[in-house]
Amino acid sequence: MPSALVRALNERAHLPVVDETNIDAFLAPAAGEPDNAVLFFTGDPAQRPEADDVAVVLPELMQVFRGRLRGAVVRRATEDKLKARFNVVVMPSLVVTRRDQPVGVLGKIRDWSEYVEKISAWLSPDVPVMVSSGGPKVEITHAGKEIAR
């Protein structure tokens, strides 16, 4: 269950909640909408209390980048299915996208100036999109037998 601050992003800030069924539609901008979006991966607020801090910062970022950035909250139950696609390693994270491609990820809570500096840079049309890592590259073995990949 999301915290009250995360719920308020939908209720008060009118940020949509996206999941695997509607994220592609959200990331495809309608006529007149910016190509860039920010996705909020909250993680479990009970285990990651800084998610509430990011939930307070996000509406302020939306104000600063009004007209240049759209925002959405990723449904908690869907985060594990979507995090590899958007290069999310830690939670909470804000993912800045250009259409359906990530251009940057900010994990945990950051200093305000870092948010503004990095997001400003990522909104440039010249910034390359991130390449998915394809998952972990570590192989765990025991006595010569593969036990996990």
From Swiss-Prot:
Q: Which SUPFAM superfamilies match?
A: Thioredoxin-like
Record-linked CDD domains? HyaE
A Pfam match is HyaE
InterPro entries (alphabetical): NiFe-hyd_mat_HyaE, Thioredoxin-like_sf
The record's annotation in Gene3D superfamilies points to: Glutaredoxin
What the record says about family reads: Belongs to the HupG/HyaE family.
This protein is called what? Answer: Hydrogenase expression/formation protein HupG
Q: Which gene encodes it?
A: hupG
